[in-house]
Every structure is written in structure tokens, then in C-alpha cells.
């Protein structure tokens, strides 16, 4: 009898050790799962935050934005319908130590139903002290067409500006919700949030970018979704997408694009 008691006691202790160990493993697994869910949750929040504007792509007629409402907060003055800002910029390093970029920004005032902006050509240098070269050409939007307000002698440049298309006019993000396992970077003190995805060259948006720009890099690009500000919405911060085709110093290539809604600067009628 004493032998059986000792045996049962020993078995009970062993079972308890196994159970405690099992509970520890279960807790570890739960922690891992909770951490995964937390990461997935932020990833979903980032995508949902972007979907509020990317679901509008492609915007065939930019003047449709005059009738589109965006996120509003206490930064808006009474009666201000707000202003949409759309921008697309392409940058490429064509020489060691230099980065050339061209792009356009357009501000669409919903109060006055007018849109003005700039086409910018810029060269920046790695060399300390060497000043950035930049030239801005004023533009406006009339009947969904870009109209130059400055005289441009170069016919090729004039044609390029007048026929410029923002990425948002031909991009399509209907599959955004299917993007998975992104590389997530978060700093809630700033705050900012980023999700990065490797996108295949067969992707429709990537194909269109390669058609429209002199992209020589062959490898698949990285798509970055960047939020600066409250992930739930803010008129102070901004959201930007960026396709990086190459980070090689002599062939660095990327395209950045954003569509944001905010208070009209200077007043409702400016």
C-alpha cells in the first residue's frame, strides 16, 4: 500500500510538473498569438485608413473631388468645405551623388471650385553645401485639363506638363485588403505608422508606372504605406504611398504619391 501511495504521489507530482509546463507553453503561445493579432490589427488599421482615399482611385476626372467630402476635425473653420491636395513625384538617380525628380502638386479648393498648383523639376546633391536646383511652373485645372500659367519655351516640357497624369488618375487598389504580412513600423509617440509590401512586377499599378516613367531597375518594387498623424484620421498629418524600385546609390528610383483632405489655407475663399 505504501508503495502504491508513493507511486501515485510521484505520478501526481509528475503530472503537475507537466501541467505547469504545459500552462507555461500555452501562455507563451497565447502571448505570441496576442502579439501577432496586435500586429495584424495595426496592419488592418493602416490599410483601412488608406482605403478611405485609395478606394477613390482611379480618379478619372479630378474635378470630381470638388464634390467629395473628406475627414473633418476641429481644425476646420466654420463654413470651410476644405481643400483636396493631390501630388505625384518621380525621382531617379541618373548620376552618382545626384537625384533628379519631377512631379506635380494640385490644390483643389472645394469652396471656390478652383484648382492651382505647380509642376516642379528638382535636382538634389549628396555633396555638402551644394544647393538644390529647383524650377516651379504654375498650373491650374480647367475642365479636367492641366493648363500652364507660365511660359515654357521647351515644347517637350510643355507637352509633358500639359499631359501630366497623377498616379491617382490611373492607379487601382481594389486588392488592398488582400495585401498580407506587411513589414510594420510604428511609433505612437510621433505618431507615425508604416506598412511595407513587396509587389510583383505583374501588378497592374507597377506595370503602369513602368510604362509612364524611365524605370531601369528590373527587380520587384517595395510599396510603402506611410501615415504621419493619428491613424484614425487627422487633418494635421498626411498619408503617402511610395514605390521603391531601387535603393542602389547610382540607380535609386522611387515614386511617391498622396491624396489628402484638409482645411483651406488662408480662409474659405482663398
Swiss-Prot record:
UniProt subcellular location: Cell membrane
UniProt keyword Acetylation present: no
Disulfide bonds: none
Lipidated residues (N-palmitoyl cysteine): 23
Keywords: Cell membrane, Lipoprotein, Membrane, Palmitate, Signal
Lipid-carrying residues in chain (S-diacylglycerol cysteine): 23
GO cellular component, one term: plasma membrane
Predominant subcellular localization, coarse grouping: membrane
Entry superkingdom: Bacteria
Xref: InterPro entries: Csa, Csa_sf
KW Lipoprotein (keyword) present: yes
Membrane topology: Lipid-anchor
PROSITE patterns named in the record: PROKAR_LIPOPROTEIN
Signal peptide: 1-22
One protein family per Pfam: DUF576
Transmembrane regions listed in the UniProt entry: none
Family per record: Belongs to the staphylococcal tandem lipoprotein family.
Protein name: Uncharacterized lipoprotein SAB0396
Amino acid at each position: 500500500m505504501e508503495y502504491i501511495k508513493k507511486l501515485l504521489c510521484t505520478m501526481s507530482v509528475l503530472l503537475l510538473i507537466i501541467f505547469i509546463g504545459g500552462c507555461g507553453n500555452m501562455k507563451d503561445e497565447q502571448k505570441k498569438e496576442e502579439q501577432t493579432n496586435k500586429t495584424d490589427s495595426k496592419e488592418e488599421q493602416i490599410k483601412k485608413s488608406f482605403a478611405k482615399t485609395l478606394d477613390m482611385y482611379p480618379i478619372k476626372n479630378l474635378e470630381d473631388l470638388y464634390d467629395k467630402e473628406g475627414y473633418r476635425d476641429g481644425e476646420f473653420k466654420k463654413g470651410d468645405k476644405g481643400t483636396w491636395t493631390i501630388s505625384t513625384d518621380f525621382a531617379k538617380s541618373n548620376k552618382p551623388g545626384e537625384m533628379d525628380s519631377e512631379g506635380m502638386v494640385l490644390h483643389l479648393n472645394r469652396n471656390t471650385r478652383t484648382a492651382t498648383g505647380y509642376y516642379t523639376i528638382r535636382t538634389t546633391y549628396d555633396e555638402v553645401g551644394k544647393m538644390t536646383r529647383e524650377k516651379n511652373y504654375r498650373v491650374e485645372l480647367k475642365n479636367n485639363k492641366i493648363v500652364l500659367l507660365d511660359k515654357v519655351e521647351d515644347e517637350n516640357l510643355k507637352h509633358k506638363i500639359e499631359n501630366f497624369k497623377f498616379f491617382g488618375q490611373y492607379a487601382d487598389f481594389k486588392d488592398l485588403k488582400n495585401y498580407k504580412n506587411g513589414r510594420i513600423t510604428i511609433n505612437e509617440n510621433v505618431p507615425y505608422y508604416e506598412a511595407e509590401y513587396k509587389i510583383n512586377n505583374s501588378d497592374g499599378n507597377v506595370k503602369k508606372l513602368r510604362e509612364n516613367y524611365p524605370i531601369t531597375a528590373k527587380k520587384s518594387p517595395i510599396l510603402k504605406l506611410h501615415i504621419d498623424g493619428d491613424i484614425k484620421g487627422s487633418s494635421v498629418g498626411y498619408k503617402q504611398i511610395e514605390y521603391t524600385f531601387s535603393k542602389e546609390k547610382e540607380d535609386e528610383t522611387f515614386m511617391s504619391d498622396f491624396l489628402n483632405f484638409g482645411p483651406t489655407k488662408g480662409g474659405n475663399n482663398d
